[in-house]
Amino acid sequence: MKGDMGQENKQAPDISLDSVASYSCEPGLMSIAAHLLKDGCTDMGSFVVSPACLYIAIETLTRGAKGETLNELESVLGGAEARRDACSLLFAKCPEQTASDYRLAIATSLWANKFTSPLRRNFGRTIADLHGKAAEVDFESSEAKALMSSWLSKNTGGKFTSAPEMDADTVFAIISALYFKDSWVDPLDDEDIEVVFRAPEPRSDVAMMGGFGSYGHLLSTREAIAVSWPMQSGAVAVFAMSNNGATLDDFVQSGAAWDAILRCRMRMGTTRPKGGIELFVPQFELRSDDRDLGGMLRSLGIEKAFLPGADFGNITEADAMVSKVIQGTMLKLDPNGAEGAAYTIFAVPAGCAPESMPEPVRVVFDHPFAFAIFSHSGAPLFVGVYRGA
């Protein structure tokens, strides 16, 4: 009998999420992803942010910090071993088997005021393994804006082409960037889809897509339903929704959404239904510009970097403190696959199917849900929620 998940809630054996919850609470990349998902869900609309892009910007700042400022930043990144592990995920070798248009590019840059805060001689080498660039510029000149914009466009696949204006008193600015594109293993179809997305405020313009796949994994607990949908490179999209009547806000804020996403990504307690999965999910393009992430970083425990007396002596001798942290992000999901880009700025002033198949498990994401996109190595590239608008 065909299982339809999404039209109504189905009870399922409860699966303990303790180990996943512990993993996501440990300082580091996954903890940052969990906090970003919760922080963004305080908005009323759909949103998308990039944990990976933010992490690289923090890592760049950390490599320039000293003393108590360094200790505080390291406590958020999880220490030396966790930092190495995170960078290994983010800069993992490109898989050999990919779609022709596959791309995952992550990079960072630091732009210092050539007049007031010349760079330490070897800082460029310090961030070389992060695909990093370090340069001294005149922030009052049009040339500086052009250089930063060119770098940003190159490293976001042309999705973001204009770097923000920097004040003349800027000591240095960090810009990290990410671009990702991949194709589904099992493409989805956007024609003759009769499923209607049930947003809090009904909308008729939410285009759905659906299709059958044999390679996805299904997580079904009393709290959540989650589905992973793989891409050609080994990257995967994970969609998660409440299975107990909880609102999307409660589902996300309780941590249940991220726990379900991680468990599904890690294949802990998941199944691959013998009949495959018939997935229905909206196709969408989300974009956010200039999202302020400073408050979220403070909630993680980063305080000294924002205060006078912050020590970034491995970057420059000049006194400096972080004044703002902003991120721009875009993510498009369509029947062919996923494409996304992001930038983060720290501004610092002074298998084969069997012949006889059971029917697939039908999973319909027809009401608000949380989602994440992971790279082939497991790095969380994007997290967000979709409400239909």
What are these regions, as identified by a protein language model?
Residues 329, 335-389:
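C-terminal soluble interaction/assembly domains
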Residues 1-139, 150, 386:
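Detector for small/aliphatic-rich hydrophobic stretches
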Residues 187-190, 240-242, 250-255, 345-346, ...:
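Composition- and surface-driven signal marking solvent-exposed, interaction-prone regions
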Residues 33, 223-226, 328, 366-370:
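Short glycine-rich loop/turn motifs
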Residues 44, 89-245, 263-355:
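Non-catalytic, conformational "gating/processing" segments within enzyme and secreted inhibitor domains
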Residues 73-77, 188-196, 248-258:
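Short Gly/aromatic-enriched secondary-structure transition segments
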